Amino acid sequence: MLPSIAKHAASHQIHPLKKHGQNFIFDGSLCDKIVRASGLEENSNVLEIGPGTGGLTRSILHKNPKLLTVIETDERCIPLLNEIKQYHPNLNIIKQDALKLKLSDLNTNKITIISNLPYHIGTELVIRWLKESSLVASMTLMLQKEVVERICAKPSTKAYGRLSVICSLIATVEKCFDVAPTAFYPPPKVYSAIVKLTPLENIPNSDLISKVELITKMAFAGRRKMIKSSLKNLAPNISELLAKLNISDNCRAENLTPNDYLSLASLI
């Protein structure tokens, strides 16, 4: 039988390292709650980034996935994960930088992603995975609460921005629950939250999404400017294009809906 998560980490003398952005979870009940929020079914193909001391890994394995692939860059954690593998042969351990991973490299059908993501690469990974959404069944992720609020934000709110637009065009998003700093060791300075993203059946093509990325980058860079000013370098006839879409050129970036940005992208 495996020791508790904390004792297992201690037996390998694993302490959190700032360079890896590590904040460990030793509370098995919290890990179970995250997996329940994912709606994980048996015989799924699962991906976890940064398993660390294996708390979330254990909870995922208790749901009997077909295969759980974990990506870990910290070589100190590999022996600990190999000990978990002795009890769960469906655990596949890859020592690699998560930013170098392409989902297509995993050679599996629809992947369920469940991860406590390092804060410093979380947003970048979400965007990358959304661009490979045809390979994703769902993503249940722990991120900074502020990032989750941006993902879930609606138009005309303070948190609404590029991330909100892109996420809502590719997936349904659901904030599951908040996680206090005290749930981690060491406690981070901010709250975290769990968010679930499920790719839509009909997703705009990659060219359109790239255009939306460009348009929103320009629009939200001048967040308080009127949209006609923010996008004046996008197209010389921007006011005409906005009028064609019944969008007032006196609107600001935060007033346009994701579909407004998509429609504008289709005209550029």
From Swiss-Prot:
Gene3D superfamilies reported for this sequence: Ribosomal RNA adenine dimethylase-like, domain 2, Vaccinia Virus protein VP39
PANTHER family associated with the record: DIMETHYLADENOSINE TRANSFERASE (PTHR11727), DIMETHYLADENOSINE TRANSFERASE-RELATED (PTHR11727:SF7)
Entry protein name: Ribosomal RNA small subunit methyltransferase A
Organism of origin is Rickettsia bellii (strain RML369-C)
Question: Which CDD domains does this entry report, sorted A to Z?
Answer: AdoMet_MTases
Question: Subcellular location, in the record's words?
Answer: Cytoplasm
Reaction equations catalysed: adenosine(1518)/adenosine(1519) in 16S rRNA + 4 S-adenosyl-L-methionine = N(6)-dimethyladenosine(1518)/N(6)-dimethyladenosine(1519) in 16S rRNA + 4 S-adenosyl-L-homocysteine + 4 H(+)
**Top-rank taxon:** Bacteria
Binding residues for S-adenosyl-L-methionine: N23, I25, G50, E72, D97, N116
Keywords, A to Z, come to: Cytoplasm, Methyltransferase, RNA-binding, rRNA processing, S-adenosyl-L-methionine, Transferase
InterPro entries, per database record: KsgA/Erm, rRNA_Ade_diMease-like_C, rRNA_Ade_Mease_Trfase_CS, rRNA_Ade_methylase_Trfase_N, rRNA_adenine_dimethylase, SAM-dependent_MTases_sf
For this UniProt entry, what's an example GO CC term? Answer: cytoplasm
User: Which Enzyme Commission number(s) are on file for it?
Assistant: 2.1.1.182
GO molecular function terms attached to this record: 16S rRNA (adenine(1518)-N(6)/adenine(1519)-N(6))-dimethyltransferase activity; RNA binding
Quote the gene name from the UniProt entry. Answer: rsmA
Assigned protein family: Belongs to the class I-like SAM-binding methyltransferase superfamily. rRNA adenine N(6)-methyltransferase family. RsmA subfamily.
Main role? Specifically dimethylates two adjacent adenosines (A1518 and A1519) in the loop of a conserved hairpin near the 3'-end of 16S rRNA in the 30S particle. May play a critical role in biogenesis of 30S subunits.
